Amino acid sequence: MAGNSIGQLFRVTTFGESHGTALGCIVDGVPPGLPLTQADLQVDLDRRKPGTSRYTTQRREPDQVRILSGVFNGVTTGTSIGLLIENTDQRSQDYSEIKDVFRPGHADYTYEQKYGLRDYRGGGRSSARETAMRVAAGAIAKKYLKQKFGIEVKGYLSQLGPISCELVDWSIVETNPFFCPDPSRLDALDEYMRALKKEGNSIGAKVTVVAEGVPAGLGEPVFDRLDADLAHALMSINAVKGVEIGDGFDVVTLKGTENRDEITKEGFSSNHAGGVLGGISSGQPIIAHIALKPTSSITIAGKTLNRQGEEVDMITKGRHDPCVGIRAVPIAEAMMAIVLLDHALRQRGQCGDVIPPLMQW
């Protein structure tokens, strides 16, 4: 299987399956001298891990990460950083009934068609369990970006089903299980999720991720444009079916006079572009949105085929998230941070001596 790595100078390679022995990753390109401990990574892993609220899967994984290499005396050495998380709460028997049946809306059918076989236990490599390692690697990127470049990456749930969540207060995002920035929507979210769970159904969501403090100049036209790489990274997250940068698809209804981000001596008058112009960061906040589909692992019967080509009805058993978007916030942050650090290092390597002719606001 190819496609397990992302990045050029800052490069992340993950391995492992949902019900395998462990998950792991190799992080290459971390400059030496960055103070780094397990606790630095655990903060974001705890934000992503399952079983933390009634609104997420009840699979209980501690997700305790181990740093195997690349750190000595509490600082990075510049060599490859090896990370490992052991799986401890697998219930493979929950999936024994689907080993010969293709769950609709899942990767079962496509993996079998591509490889001729599949690990049916929790989806194997296609499971979102893999994203734990992205979050661990992303925590390294987030720390370096903040310490060395003053860049901060953070995200929030901006919509769950029909309920929109406006950015009212960043400070409350980490105080509720939805990562919602609007306190007036918490009761509605709770009521909606309770009804959804009773129904045995699932729902989609929208997550917004923002990077502040990004300098102008990141991005490598034409094929490694910053927005192109961000879209690629965010689209690689399980269940993501759409990515928007800035105003995204809303620009279809805008006129040029409305969409252009005019420039004055005080700076940009707006940020419809989401902080990227011509594939290069403008110095404004980078803003991206992702749309996540509702999981097909629900307790309502649906039609599918088995390996013999026979039509069957099936109900997915096991422990699943009724809304995968809730736990996607730290994953989206991680993917944006990985891309930004890769481009920051590339910019420093090629254009580190360039003096911008204009000030950055």
Swiss-Prot record:
The keyword Lyase applies. Pathway: Metabolic intermediate biosynthesis; chorismate biosynthesis; chorismate from D-erythrose 4-phosphate and phosphoenolpyruvate: step 7/7. This is Chorismate synthase. GO terms for biological process: amino acid biosynthetic process; aromatic amino acid family biosynthetic process; chorismate biosynthetic process. FMN binds at R125, S126, S127, N238, A239, G278, K293, P294, T295, S296, S297, R319. The keyword NADP applies. Belongs to the chorismate synthase family. Reduced FMN (FMNH(2)). Pfam families: Chorismate_synt. It catalyses: 5-O-(1-carboxyvinyl)-3-phosphoshikimate = chorismate + phosphate. Homotetramer. Its EC number is 4.2.3.5. This reaction introduces a second double bond into the aromatic ring system. NADP(+) binds at R48, R54. GO terms for cellular component: cytosol. Its cofactor is FMNH2. It comes from Proteus mirabilis (strain HI4320). One of its GO terms (molecular function) is chorismate synthase activity. Keywords: Amino-acid biosynthesis, Aromatic amino acid biosynthesis, FAD, Flavoprotein, FMN, Lyase, NADP.
